[in-house]
Protein backbone atom coordinates (compact mmCIF):
# COMPACT_ATOMS: atom_id res chain seq x y z
CA UNK A 1 0.00 0.00 0.00
CA UNK A 2 1.18 3.55 -0.74
CA UNK A 3 1.16 6.43 1.71
CA UNK A 4 -0.51 9.05 -0.49
CA UNK A 5 -3.10 11.26 1.16
CA UNK A 6 -5.16 11.57 -2.04
CA UNK A 7 -8.13 9.38 -2.97
CA UNK A 8 -9.30 10.04 -6.53
CA UNK A 9 -13.06 9.66 -6.98
CA UNK A 10 -13.52 7.52 -10.08
CA UNK A 11 -16.95 8.93 -10.93
CA UNK A 12 -17.55 7.65 -14.44
CA UNK A 13 -20.61 6.05 -16.01
CA UNK A 14 -18.86 3.22 -17.87
CA UNK A 15 -16.12 0.77 -17.03
CA UNK A 16 -13.95 1.36 -20.08
CA UNK A 17 -13.68 5.09 -19.50
CA UNK A 18 -12.99 4.54 -15.80
CA UNK A 19 -10.20 2.04 -16.44
CA UNK A 20 -8.65 4.11 -19.21
CA UNK A 21 -8.64 7.13 -16.93
CA UNK A 22 -7.16 5.18 -14.00
CA UNK A 23 -4.36 3.99 -16.27
CA UNK A 24 -3.31 7.62 -16.81
CA UNK A 25 -2.68 8.09 -13.07
CA UNK A 26 0.26 7.01 -10.93
CA UNK A 27 -0.82 4.47 -8.29
CA UNK A 28 2.04 5.66 -6.08
CA UNK A 29 0.43 9.11 -5.86
CA UNK A 30 -3.16 8.20 -5.04
CA UNK A 31 -5.76 5.66 -4.12
CA UNK A 32 -9.05 5.17 -6.00
CA UNK A 33 -12.64 5.54 -4.82
CA UNK A 34 -15.38 3.55 -6.56
CA UNK A 35 -18.93 4.65 -5.83
CA UNK A 36 -22.43 3.32 -6.29
CA UNK A 37 -22.96 4.12 -9.97
CA UNK A 38 -19.76 2.59 -11.26
CA UNK A 39 -19.83 -0.43 -8.96
CA UNK A 40 -23.46 -1.16 -9.84
CA UNK A 41 -22.51 -1.03 -13.51
CA UNK A 42 -19.21 -2.92 -13.46
CA UNK A 43 -19.24 -4.98 -10.26
CA UNK A 44 -16.37 -6.79 -8.53
CA UNK A 45 -14.50 -7.29 -11.81
CA UNK A 46 -13.75 -3.57 -11.88
CA UNK A 47 -12.24 -3.73 -8.40
CA UNK A 48 -9.99 -6.59 -9.47
CA UNK A 49 -8.83 -4.69 -12.57
CA UNK A 50 -8.05 -1.55 -10.57
CA UNK A 51 -6.06 -3.58 -8.08
CA UNK A 52 -4.10 -5.12 -10.96
CA UNK A 53 -3.15 -1.56 -11.93
CA UNK A 54 -1.66 -1.21 -8.46
CA UNK A 55 -4.36 0.87 -6.79
CA UNK A 56 -5.69 0.59 -3.26
CA UNK A 57 -9.49 0.80 -3.61
CA UNK A 58 -11.96 2.59 -1.37
CA UNK A 59 -15.36 0.98 -2.07
CA UNK A 60 -17.76 3.82 -1.33
CA UNK A 61 -21.16 2.12 -1.02
CA UNK A 62 -22.28 3.69 2.28
CA UNK A 63 -24.03 0.61 3.68
CA UNK A 64 -27.10 1.47 5.78
CA UNK A 65 -29.45 -1.37 6.77
CA UNK A 66 -30.21 -3.67 9.68
CA UNK A 67 -27.08 -4.90 11.51
CA UNK A 68 -26.98 -8.44 10.08
CA UNK A 69 -27.39 -7.24 6.51
CA UNK A 70 -24.67 -4.61 6.84
CA UNK A 71 -22.32 -7.09 8.52
CA UNK A 72 -22.77 -9.57 5.66
CA UNK A 73 -22.23 -6.85 3.05
CA UNK A 74 -19.05 -5.67 4.78
CA UNK A 75 -17.70 -9.21 4.90
CA UNK A 76 -18.31 -9.73 1.18
CA UNK A 77 -16.81 -6.34 0.31
CA UNK A 78 -13.71 -7.18 2.31
CA UNK A 79 -13.32 -10.45 0.43
CA UNK A 80 -12.79 -8.41 -2.75
CA UNK A 81 -9.52 -7.18 -1.29
CA UNK A 82 -10.49 -3.52 -1.03
CA UNK A 83 -8.51 -1.16 1.17
CA UNK A 84 -11.50 0.56 2.75
CA UNK A 85 -15.32 0.50 2.91
CA UNK A 86 -17.88 2.71 4.59
CA UNK A 87 -21.23 2.67 6.36
CA UNK A 88 -23.68 5.37 7.46
CA UNK A 89 -23.21 6.38 11.10
CA UNK A 90 -26.93 7.18 11.22
CA UNK A 91 -27.48 3.41 11.19
CA UNK A 92 -26.74 3.49 14.92
CA UNK A 93 -24.41 1.71 17.29
CA UNK A 94 -25.75 -1.82 16.75
CA UNK A 95 -25.20 -1.56 13.03
CA UNK A 96 -21.75 0.01 13.45
CA UNK A 97 -20.66 -2.67 15.90
CA UNK A 98 -21.90 -5.44 13.61
CA UNK A 99 -19.98 -3.96 10.69
CA UNK A 100 -16.82 -3.66 12.79
CA UNK A 101 -17.08 -7.24 14.05
CA UNK A 102 -17.56 -8.54 10.50
CA UNK A 103 -14.12 -7.17 9.64
CA UNK A 104 -12.26 -8.44 12.71
CA UNK A 105 -8.97 -9.98 11.62
CA UNK A 106 -9.27 -8.59 8.09
CA UNK A 107 -7.14 -5.90 6.44
CA UNK A 108 -10.03 -3.81 5.12
CA UNK A 109 -10.48 -0.52 6.97
CA UNK A 110 -13.94 0.65 8.02
CA UNK A 111 -15.10 4.25 8.19
CA UNK A 112 -18.47 5.92 8.70
CA UNK A 113 -20.25 8.64 6.80
CA UNK A 114 -21.46 11.40 9.10
CA UNK A 115 -23.30 13.98 6.99
CA UNK A 116 -23.10 14.24 3.23
CA UNK A 117 -21.08 17.30 2.23
CA UNK A 118 -24.01 18.56 0.14
CA UNK A 119 -26.10 19.05 3.30
CA UNK A 120 -26.39 22.31 5.23
CA UNK A 121 -28.38 23.58 8.22
CA UNK A 122 -31.57 24.02 6.17
CA UNK A 123 -31.39 20.41 4.98
CA UNK A 124 -31.09 19.19 8.58
CA UNK A 125 -34.04 21.31 9.69
CA UNK A 126 -36.11 19.91 6.84
CA UNK A 127 -35.40 16.41 8.19
CA UNK A 128 -36.30 17.38 11.75
CA UNK A 129 -32.71 17.18 12.99
CA UNK A 130 -31.83 19.97 15.39
CA UNK A 131 -28.33 21.36 15.62
CA UNK A 132 -25.72 22.65 13.23
CA UNK A 133 -23.97 20.34 10.77
CA UNK A 134 -20.84 20.65 12.91
CA UNK A 135 -22.63 19.41 16.05
CA UNK A 136 -24.27 16.49 14.24
CA UNK A 137 -20.99 15.50 12.58
CA UNK A 138 -19.20 15.50 15.94
CA UNK A 139 -21.90 13.40 17.56
CA UNK A 140 -21.87 10.80 14.79
CA UNK A 141 -18.07 10.74 14.53
CA UNK A 142 -17.59 10.07 18.23
CA UNK A 143 -20.25 7.35 18.06
CA UNK A 144 -18.31 5.68 15.25
CA UNK A 145 -15.11 5.92 17.24
CA UNK A 146 -16.72 4.34 20.30
CA UNK A 147 -17.87 1.48 18.07
CA UNK A 148 -14.30 0.79 16.97
CA UNK A 149 -14.37 2.18 13.43
CA UNK A 150 -11.14 3.46 11.89
CA UNK A 151 -12.46 6.90 11.03
CA UNK A 152 -15.19 8.99 9.47
CA UNK A 153 -15.96 11.01 6.39
CA UNK A 154 -16.31 14.68 7.27
CA UNK A 155 -15.80 18.01 5.58
CA UNK A 156 -12.49 19.76 6.04
CA UNK A 157 -14.37 22.51 7.86
CA UNK A 158 -15.23 20.07 10.66
CA UNK A 159 -11.87 18.30 10.73
CA UNK A 160 -10.12 20.61 13.21
CA UNK A 161 -12.66 20.16 16.00
CA UNK A 162 -12.94 16.43 15.30
CA UNK A 163 -9.19 15.98 15.39
CA UNK A 164 -9.10 17.67 18.78
CA UNK A 165 -11.89 15.48 20.17
CA UNK A 166 -11.05 12.14 18.52
CA UNK A 167 -7.27 12.19 18.83
CA UNK A 168 -4.46 11.70 16.34
CA UNK A 169 -5.10 8.07 15.33
CA UNK A 170 -8.72 8.42 14.15
CA UNK A 171 -8.90 8.82 10.37
CA UNK A 172 -10.66 11.88 8.94
CA UNK A 173 -11.54 11.45 5.27
CA UNK A 174 -12.47 14.76 3.65
CA UNK A 175 -14.32 15.13 0.35
CA UNK A 176 -15.23 18.49 -1.16
CA UNK A 177 -11.59 19.34 -1.87
CA UNK A 178 -11.00 22.02 -4.48
CA UNK A 179 -8.18 24.33 -5.43
CA UNK A 180 -8.97 28.01 -4.98
CA UNK A 181 -10.03 28.46 -8.62
CA UNK A 182 -12.13 25.29 -8.99
CA UNK A 183 -15.91 25.28 -9.39
CA UNK A 184 -17.87 24.42 -6.22
CA UNK A 185 -20.12 21.99 -8.17
CA UNK A 186 -22.67 20.44 -5.74
CA UNK A 187 -20.52 20.42 -2.60
CA UNK A 188 -21.68 22.85 0.08
CA UNK A 189 -18.79 22.46 2.52
CA UNK A 190 -15.54 22.62 0.57
CA UNK A 191 -11.90 23.48 1.30
CA UNK A 192 -8.47 23.57 -0.29
CA UNK A 193 -5.92 20.79 0.36
CA UNK A 194 -3.84 23.11 2.53
CA UNK A 195 -6.80 23.95 4.74
CA UNK A 196 -7.85 20.30 5.02
CA UNK A 197 -4.38 19.06 6.01
CA UNK A 198 -3.88 21.86 8.51
CA UNK A 199 -7.28 21.06 10.01
CA UNK A 200 -6.16 17.48 10.63
CA UNK A 201 -7.49 15.56 7.62
CA UNK A 202 -5.97 12.11 7.08
CA UNK A 203 -7.03 11.60 3.45
CA UNK A 204 -8.51 13.92 0.84
CA UNK A 205 -11.12 12.76 -1.68
CA UNK A 206 -10.70 14.65 -4.94
CA UNK A 207 -12.91 14.05 -7.96
CA UNK A 208 -13.70 16.53 -10.70
CA UNK A 209 -10.63 18.78 -10.25
CA UNK A 210 -8.60 15.73 -11.34
CA UNK A 211 -11.02 13.68 -13.46
CA UNK A 212 -12.09 16.69 -15.54
CA UNK A 213 -8.63 18.17 -15.84
CA UNK A 214 -7.07 18.36 -19.33
CA UNK A 215 -4.00 16.75 -17.74
CA UNK A 216 -5.16 14.52 -14.83
CA UNK A 217 -1.68 13.32 -13.86
CA UNK A 218 -0.39 16.90 -13.71
CA UNK A 219 -3.40 17.89 -11.60
CA UNK A 220 -2.76 14.94 -9.27
CA UNK A 221 0.88 15.92 -8.92
CA UNK A 222 -0.10 19.53 -8.21
CA UNK A 223 -2.47 18.47 -5.43
CA UNK A 224 0.21 16.17 -3.97
CA UNK A 225 2.73 19.01 -3.99
CA UNK A 226 0.29 21.25 -2.12
CA UNK A 227 -0.31 18.54 0.48
CA UNK A 228 3.42 17.99 1.01
CA UNK A 229 3.88 21.72 1.50
CA UNK A 230 1.08 21.77 4.09
CA UNK A 231 2.44 18.87 6.17
UniProtKB/Swiss-Prot annotation:
CDD domains from the UniProt entry: OMP_decarboxylase_like
Keywords assigned: Decarboxylase, Lyase, Pyrimidine biosynthesis
Superkingdom, taxonomy of origin: Bacteria
Residues involved in substrate binding: 11, 33, 60-69, 117, 178, 187, 207-208
SMART domains linked to this entry: OMPdecase (SM00934)
Record EC number: 4.1.1.23
UniProt-recorded Gene Ontology molecular function terms: orotidine-5'-phosphate decarboxylase activity
SUPFAM superfamilies hit by this protein: Ribulose-phoshate binding barrel
List of catalytic residues: 62
This protein's pathway: Pyrimidine metabolism; UMP biosynthesis via de novo pathway; UMP from orotate: step 2/2
GO BP term, example: 'de novo' pyrimidine nucleobase biosynthetic process
Catalytic reaction annotation: orotidine 5'-phosphate + H(+) = UMP + CO2
Family stated for the protein in its record: Belongs to the OMP decarboxylase family. Type 1 subfamily.
Known role: Catalyzes the decarboxylation of orotidine 5'-monophosphate (OMP) to uridine 5'-monophosphate (UMP).
Assembly behavior: Homodimer.
PANTHER family: OROTIDINE 5'-PHOSPHATE DECARBOXYLASE
Name of the protein described by the UniProt record: Orotidine 5'-phosphate decarboxylase
Organism: Nitrosomonas eutropha (strain DSM 101675 / C91 / Nm57)
Amino acid sequence: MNDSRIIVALDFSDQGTALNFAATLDSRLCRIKVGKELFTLAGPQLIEKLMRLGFDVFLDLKFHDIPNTVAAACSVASSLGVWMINVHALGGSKMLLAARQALDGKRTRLIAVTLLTSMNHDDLSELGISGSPEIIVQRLALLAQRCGLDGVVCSALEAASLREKAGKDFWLITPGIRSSNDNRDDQARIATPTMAIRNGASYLVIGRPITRSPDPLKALQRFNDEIVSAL
